[in-house]
Amino acid sequence: GVILVNINPAYRSSELEYVLKQSGCQWLVSAGSFKTSDYHAMLQGLVPELAGQAIGKLHSERLPELRGVISLDAQPPQGFLPWSQLTGLAGSVSVEQLHERQDSLHFDQAVNIQYTSGTTGFPKGATLSHYNILNNGYMVGESLGLSAVDRLVIPVPLYHCFGMVMGNLGCITHGSTMIYPSDAFDPLLTLRTVAEEKATALYGVPTMFIAMLDQPQRAEFDLSSLRTGIMAGATCPIEVMRRVINEMHMNEVQIAYGMTETSPVSLQTGPSDDLELRVTTVGRTQPQLESKIIDEAGNLVPRGTIGELCTRGYSVMLGYWNNPQGTAEAIDQAGWMHTGDLASMNEEGYVCIAGRNKDMIIRGGENIYPRELEEFFFTHPAVADVQVIGIPCSRYGEEIVAWIKFHPGHS
């Protein structure tokens, strides 16, 4: 019955304190350190009372609901409960007690809180149920055609829905093998893992695939076992998609669209979709879900017209944790999740994302969608990645700026 609160390992002390306090976390499980972060030192600074109080009976001034910290290190500092001791406590719980607790759970209860980007203020805790994430992981796996013979390499973070739901739960619900190539993304290790493990599927965001495609040693690895995977998490450049299919043998690679608040996937291309659809759209609405495109007044727009994308169904979160106002702003009374993304839908139901509503550039009264310009830049063979933004301009209101990353050897 415990609710898992996913925490970004890159958080600094202030961000960690906010999430722990806002969610009301009672227990925290932590590694001792990772990369440049010393988590033990960070927690000792946030909770100086740790060293002087009994484990499990913590009373912290800054984090009043926190009762203890569990460390994955074998010999953590005083006040931290070692993981090895925690697992030993299971012997004090009877099978009858376990079954009683299991029987008390309901599929619609919260099981996971994932904090979304704080670009519009403090991060909000998207609260997801068993029903949300188990079904979404299953549906993603169904679209990929996963089975017990598949071996999925998961280099994406497990604290995000991409790794946790689309990766872990997608595999668990289909009997597929989960493979983690490294503790943090490394393009060389990921390619080596695919080759050594004869992986059939691979996940990644576009920048990950770009890094793997540009890895100088890529030709040394046999990637012919790959057949499918997902590129998601950000706009998927057309040229990158073509290279993944042609150079990494991922003939059935799919695009998935969604957000943390929708568990996460709402739309996905299918294995039978032709290349044109997979590189120009994010697919069609998943089974058991609904999508619509609306104008600023909330009215449906004609097919092919750009408006805000909204989705509804089993995948929509329970709400933002302890944030009823934020929940009401995101989910309307009819249950539609307002994504904030601009999109259009064709006659066959395929959706094309034009960009974020707030990212649209208005230059001299003209609406300009960064995605369209980015796709044009990607047609140049020297361009590895590009981001288009608008900046204030006294003459036109906004002016267009493009940040471009070149492939090695180009300028």
Give a label for each model feature.
Residues 62-66, 70-71, 76-77, 81-115, ...:
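Conserved pre-ATP/AMP-binding loop-to-beta segment of ANL
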Residues 93-96, 107, 112, 126-147, ...:
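Conserved structural elements of the adenylate-forming
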Residues 2-85, 408:
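Structural core segment of the AMP-binding/adenylate-forming
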Residues 2-21, 32-38, 176-197, 208, ...:
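ATP-dependent adenylate-forming carboxylate-activation enzymes
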Residues 134-151, 161-201, 215:
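Conserved AMP-binding/adenylation subdomain of ANL enzymes
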Residues 87-88, 176, 196-204, 213-277, ...:
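Gly/Ser/Thr-rich phosphate-binding loop
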Residues 11-21, 28-32, 202, 297, ...:
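AMP-binding/adenylate-forming catalytic core of the ANL superfamily
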Residues 24-27, 48-70, 151-153, 179, ...:
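Conserved helix-loop-beta element of the AMP-binding
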